[in-house]
Swiss-Prot record:
Protein's recorded name: DnaJ homolog subfamily C member 25 homolog
Gene Ontology annotations for the cellular component aspect, listed alphabetically: endomembrane system; endoplasmic reticulum membrane
Similarity comment text for this entry: Belongs to the DNAJC25 family.
Transmembrane segments: 8-28, 123-143, 218-238
Entry annotated with the keyword Transmembrane helix: yes
Coiled coil: 158-208
Keyword annotations: Chaperone, Coiled coil, Membrane, Transmembrane, Transmembrane helix
Cell compartments where the protein resides: Membrane
Pfam short name (any one): DnaJ
Naturally occurring in which organism (per UniProt): Drosophila melanogaster (Fruit fly)
Span of domain J: 31-99
GO biological process, one term: protein folding
UniProt topology in membrane: Multi-pass membrane protein
InterPro entries per UniProt: DnaJ_domain, DnaJ_domain_CS, DNAJC25-like, J_dom_sf
Amino acid sequence: MRTHGLRLVLLALLPTMALGLLEGLYCGKENCYDVLGVTRESSKSEIGKAYRQLARRYHPDLHRGAEAKAAAETQFKLVATAYEILRDEESRTDYDYMLDNPDAYYAHYYRYYRRRVAPKVDVRVVIVVVLTIVSVIQYYSGWQRYDSAIKYFATVPKYRNQALEIARDEIQEKIQKKGKNRMSKNDQRDELERIIRRVIEEKMDVKGGYAKPTLWDVLWVQLIICPYTILSFIVWHAQWFWRYTVMKQPYGREQKLYLIRRHLGMGQHQFEAQEDKLIEEYLHLKLWKRENFVAWKAEQEEEMKKKLAENPRYKAYRRYMKNHGPGRITFED
């Protein structure tokens, strides 16, 4: 009995399945081309013209009576659905594929709902929004790092005293004045901190990752000037090769610092954050020469070993490793 019922259902669906028409997909059991009265060879303009004519004919407001309005509304929705499918090239291609391949039952459902569920936002818009958000966060984070660096320098006695010495006249004029215009203690403290911060910002050359951020550092600008950056990189290396490899010209200060930084394996910001005294020591030792750098590095490693050997905590660690060996993880643990 069940087998007989299943056969009846299949026989009922056979005409539409043979035509490639599936209930719930596109125009349902109707052919979208027939709904608009066009053919598969019709152009976009012909499809649009047919839609406008049928939309005026079946618009519910042009019909009177409940039954007439209901029938017109149903047909109007079908016409609108057919037009939405056929006016878009991608959905029209999928619909034609369904008509040409009625046996690919599951593929039709996948293509249809993939297009329905897929986001309609342009990928280019998403990329622009993401780049903008990253650039804003990058710029804001740069200001936070710079602000924390200035606050730190304002607490260091060396830089704080220098700022007080530079702003001595301004402090006497604004803070240490007497009479009716004399500031309260809280106002004096706030004004003093403001003056110290301003002097440090003006005089202190903060470098490295805590440097004062500029718009040139954000991702958006870097992407825009990327072709220029690549070209400059190629030209710089070509000039370096010609001047110092082919022509054997002597190195200048900037070239020496570049070689030292490369030997140390530091980035530009990290190297610029080094103290001036330490950088001058690198230059004095001529560390831009590979053989000098190798010898200096060996000496540094040897000194580090001596310091560790004299360190009580390191001695205790070595005794522990000698007696117990490295720790092991077992299944019993």
